[in-house]
Amino acid sequence: MPLGIAVPGSDIDIVCHAPDPNAFADIVWTHYQSADDFVLYRWATGTRPAIARFVWDGWPFELFGDLRPVDQQQGWIHFEVERRLLALDAGRLRRAVSELRADGLKTEPAFAAVLGIPGDPYRGLLELVAEADAALRARLAACGLG
């Protein structure tokens, strides 16, 4: 897994640019409806992305199709912030996040807990995207990780 923090049961998230989420949902339905644990739904708010969850060949997947280009989607931005933080750290952040993930926390709440980000962990991580590497290193150091 790309971040190296997967735990048993972690799914493979695939973020897709879907200019027409209905067409995306139709394609996903056509190809994966027979997969184990298949679920397909649309959010009722925002850009109303189409989300599919299923198990294929023993691997749990989540496909997320949104109107926005991938690099503008929150899931991708979270991934990029997490990747940057892990690259700036010598391994302590990865271990701390992995321990919380093993205890059942999802990825973003685990990062927020380790980094001392208050409030909504998803918004908190989004706020880090504009920070320079030096600021991220300082944040890691303040948490005893840098």
Predicted features by range, described:
Residues P69-G146:
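Catalytic cores of NTP-dependent nucleotidyl/adenyl transfer enzymes across multiple folds
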